Amino acid sequence: QNIVDNNRKIMDQTVDSIENYLVNMRQVSDAAYYDVIKENDIREQNDSIHKGLNLLYEANKENLRSIAIYNGYGSLMAAEPVVAQKEEPDVTRQGWFMQAKTRMENIHFSTPHVQNLFDDGTCRYYWVISSSRVVELTNGTDTQLGVLLVDMDYSGISRMMERINTSGKGQYFYLCDGEGNIIYHPHQARIDNGMDTESSVKAASSKEKIYDEYLEKNHRKVMVGAISYTGWRLVCVMPYEIFTNKMADVKQFVLLILLLMAMMLVFVNRMIS
């Protein structure tokens, strides 16, 4: 029970940290939309839009990779930081764009992916989590729908998860979305290579916060925590070996105490006699 309680505390703290991180990203998206996009004409006041996006980026650049505005046809209208767009990326086929257009009332968060929209001249590849939403763009006397993209640096989430995956006892924590797509997993490389599997779809859909399961004949206890707004799940996997090993340690400790008591009794009896 101590193992479960300790892991529950770790999960609660981590859920709070991830939620705070995502709230900050939503606030960036809200500020970009309500304070910049809705206050300026996308064509006549493009400089003001760039300035507003730049201020937001500079204030949050430790956690951001880019902020971009696209029209409904996928054409880039504005972006920060100012870098070259890669040659004709068809954003209309990308998941973050389609999600925003399909469900227009929410901000959507993608699973991690390599950003392939902009070229900053370093020839580096950046892993990001994209948040996207439909926005209303003002163009003179007309309005049109577009998509606001905020790319978060994936390393922020990755560092949070790495900090709690240090026990070395066989247990681990992973993060998935509401459909079971993995966002972070300490064994991701083995899963990608087909050497490991994970029951993330079950964890994502489970209504129970803690349950037992068998995965490839391995008995495990699974604990699930929900990340507000996103539908993400933080999952703790505890192999039953850690519970049996704990019991074995307790038994060894009790036997050691009994042995010491027996030795003390023998010693006392000899002293008396």
Protein language model features and the residues they cover:
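Juxtamembrane extracytoplasmic/periplasmic/luminal helical "stalk" adjacent to the first N-terminal
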Residues: 1-42
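Solvent-exposed, extracytoplasmic
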Residues: 50-58, 83, 147-190
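Extracytoplasmic/periplasmic ligand-binding sensor regions of membrane-associated signaling proteins
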Residues: 58-63, 73-152
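Amphipathic coiled-coil signal-relay and dimerization helices
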Residues: 70-82, 180-186, 223-225
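Short loop/turn segments at beta-alpha junctions that line or gate ligand-sensing/allosteric surfaces
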Residues: 90, 110-121, 187, 192-193, ...
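Soluble sensory domains of the PAS superfamily and closely related sensory modules
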Residues: 95-107, 197-214
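Extracytoplasmic
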Residues: 119-148, 159, 166-169, 215-231, ...
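Cytoplasm-proximal transmembrane signaling helix
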Residues: 233-273
